[in-house]
C-alpha cells in the first residue's frame, strides 16, 4: 500500500476519533457512564423529585424519620379525596374572588405525586423542624405581620374570621393603607398570612404584590413544590450549569464555577447568590453567599449562606443535601436532603427562558382594576377598596378549598 494511501486512511481515522470525542463532550448529553470524559462524576441529565415529602416533620410524627407503608397509602387517599371534592364543586356557587382563588387547583399542583418514605426533608435538627427564629427575625416578622393585618382588617376575611386573619380583628379601614411597607414585600412578608403569598392588600404599584405575582418567586435553595419541579444539569470542565423549570413558568438558571477562586466582593449581591464549587470525592460541594436583600428564603435574605452537596448515587439517582445558615434568622444551621430521579432526555424539555412574564396580563390588569375601584369609590359608585380583598388577601390555604380548608393532610 502506498504511503499516500496510508496517509489518507490515517487522516480519516484521526478525523473520526476527533468527531467521536467531540460528541462525547457535548454538554447536556446523557451517558450510561457515571463519569465525564474528563474524569469527574457525571451529574448531567434532567432530574425531578418524584415523591411528596414535607419540608418539616408534622408534629404527630415527631421523632419518626419514616412513614409506614399504611400511613403513606392513607395520606395518598386523603389527598386524592380532597382533590375530588374540589373537582365536584359547582363553580356557579362561588363569587368571582373565590373562583379566581380556585384557579390554582389540581391541574396546577402536583397532587399526583405519591408520599415519600421520609417524614421530612429536614434531617438536622433530628426533630425534622426548622430551628427557632432569632429575636431579630421574630421582631421583623411581627412588624410585617402587624402591617399586613392592618390592611385586611376591614375585609370579609377578618369579618368572617377566615384563615389568613389569625391574630387580627375586624374593624374600619386602617390609616396605615397609605404607609410604605416596613420591609420590602417578598414571598413571605405576610408572615405566613394567607394566600396573598407575601402580597399586601393593596395594589398601588407592582411592589405591593408578592414575588410570585411578579414572576420573581424562584429562590435558592429550591426544593420544588406543589406546582412541579424539574432541573437540568450540564457540565463542562471547570463549570456546571443548572437550569430550573419550576412553578408557573418561573424557571431560572445558575452557573457554578468549579474553582478555588474567592467569592465576589461582599458588596456585589445577586438574586441567587454567588456559587463556588469544588469536588470532595464523588460529591460536588457548592458554597453559596452574597444573596440580594430582595431575595427571600424562609425569612432569610442577604445573610443566607448555603453549603450544597450534589452526589450521584447510581445511574438514576442524585442526592442533594444542603446546610442552611443565617445567624440573623435562625438559632442554628439546619440541613435538608432530597433525592432526584433521572428523566428521559427525549421525552422531556427544560425551557431555558422563564415563561411567566410572557403574556402576563395579570399584573397590569390588577393595577388597572385597582384604579377603577378607587374612581368608583370616589364617585360613590362602589365600596371602599380598603374593604375588598385585592387578588385574594388570604383564606385559600392550599388552593383547593373555598373555606380555607387545607387539602394537604400533613398540615392538619
Task: Give the label of every model feature segment.
Residues 2-412:
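PEST-like low-complexity, intrinsically disordered acidic/proline/serine-rich tracts
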